[in-house]
């Protein structure tokens, strides 16, 4: 079986709104294939002043 790795760092604050949902999609055209997400990582940091809402 062939295996591919995709690794990308994206500054999401530059491309998405404050609230967002993330999903995955894959296709092979007319053929059947199984796609697996073997690892997923997300890191978030809250910026702002202390005590703000």
Curated annotation (Swiss-Prot):
Keywords: Lectin. Coiled coil: none annotated. Pfam families: Lectin_legB. Transmembrane segments: none annotated. Signal peptide: none annotated. One of its GO terms (molecular function) is carbohydrate binding. The keyword Ribosomal protein does not apply. Gene3D superfamilies: 2.60.120.200. SUPFAM superfamilies: Concanavalin A-like lectins/glucanases. Tetramer of two alpha and two beta chains. Belongs to the leguminous lectin family. This is Lectin alpha chain. It comes from Lathyrus aphaca. The lineage of its organism: Eukaryota, Viridiplantae, Streptophyta, Embryophyta, Tracheophyta.
């Amino acid at each position: 079986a062939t295996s591919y790795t995709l690794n990308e760092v994206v500054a999401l604050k530059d491309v998405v709104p404050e609230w967002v949902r993330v999903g995955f999609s894959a296709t092979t055209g007319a053929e059947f294939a199984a796609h697996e997400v073997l690892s997923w990582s997300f890191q978030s940091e809250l910026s702002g002043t202390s005590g703000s809402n």
